[in-house]
């Protein structure tokens, strides 16, 4: 018994060695499969992959599947040698395929690994290049994947990380430091300045090239001034005094000559009647009256005072007016010393420079641009017959009658102020402005003043005369052209062109007052 126990272990050991020797060829094939291509054991159940892990961390070129269905040595002690032989025959008939590893191509994109296990077409090998791999069926063209290095991402593909940097306190937006709006403001300001400068330049150019305005009076304004009638001398005096007393405006030339003496008179020889008359010499501008008393502004003269003091709204007073009222002859305005004073060179140059339109409708002012009238003395003509004195409007329009010879009184009489202002002289029928019988008839004809020209001694009345001269051609006829007409036509022209005190405008017509005038030609009607 003891011997039997001693021999039993060696027998079992020898049996195991014999069994190991029987399974030796399949084991060698398995060792070769791990070093070469990976194969699939045909004896594996369901074609399950048996080969395992990649050698060297999965970087080996080809891996061989280990036959999992082969029993290991000593695992099945009860199998027979016939079963071991059948397993060896099946291992020789196995089909092998390769797997292409994952790699980065030329564009830097990663391609995943794929298996070449299409056994029907025979594409079982991984072929191509390191950057382009595909399956093929030619064993000698397969790719040695262990020599490729494109298993890591290339450097040029790696993009730097973009980190969002939050703005610090120095990078914050400050509206006060923003200067982008300044450009808009500057551009708009320059455009506005250019527009304003252009407008001012246009206005200045128009004013510089504008033609000078002429002294034209509208017809309607002239009609209104004509219908207003003559202005009383007292009113003219007030306006003239206010115009003279007021201080001149700034930069306005002040006349060096006095305006107080508008119509100087001269002293003439005494007549046999021992009566003195002051006759105005209209063409003289240097002599001053010697018998006049100081009066306010000395505007009124012997030519205007008698009519002014006896002025009335009744036609019955026409009988006391001199014959020159009926002749209605316009005189030359340039012969008056008042107009000569207005045409001084200094004032003319100033007002022509200013180019103001004279406001002739405003009272108390003088015309700015005085019309230069011809001062040439016309040729002497035959003096017309003296018309009869107007007693009424009907008699003025009546046919011409014979003139009495009582009018032929001395013409060089000089009247004193007391005689001119006396009641007898005012209501007398003697001619106040009778022409002189001298060798120069034009001086006597120039004194034939119409009803509206009695007030011609002041600048205000000169303004109205110029208004009528510019507005109506019939009102500015020459004195000699008027004298050439018939006597009846002259009467009608005098009262038709300027009806200032017509019946429609008279508010009260007093009765005729018979006064003793001590006149040689007194006629009572």
Swiss-Prot record:
Subcellular location: Postsynaptic density membrane
Top-rank lineage group of the source organism: Eukaryota
Residue numbers of Phosphothreonine PTMs: 458, 502
Keyword annotations: Cell membrane, Glycoprotein, Membrane, Phosphoprotein, Postsynaptic cell membrane, Signal, Synapse, Transmembrane, Transmembrane helix, Wnt signaling pathway
Ranges that cross the membrane: 181-201
Annotated spans, Disordered: 241-294, 469-495
Segments in the Extracellular topological domain: 31-180
UniProt modified residues of type Phosphoserine: 416, 422, 434
Signal peptide: 1-30
Subunit composition and interactions: Component of the postsynaptic hippocampal AMPA-type glutamate receptor (AMPAR) complex, at least composed of pore forming AMPAR subunits GRIA1, GRIA2 and GRIA3 and AMPAR auxiliary proteins SHISA6 and SHISA7. Interacts (via PDZ-binding motif) with DLG4/PSD-95 (via PDZ domain); the interaction is direct.
UniProt remark on domains: The PDZ-binding motif interacts with PDZ-domain of scaffolding protein DLG4.
Family indicated by similarity: Belongs to the shisa family.
Protein name, entry field: Protein shisa-6
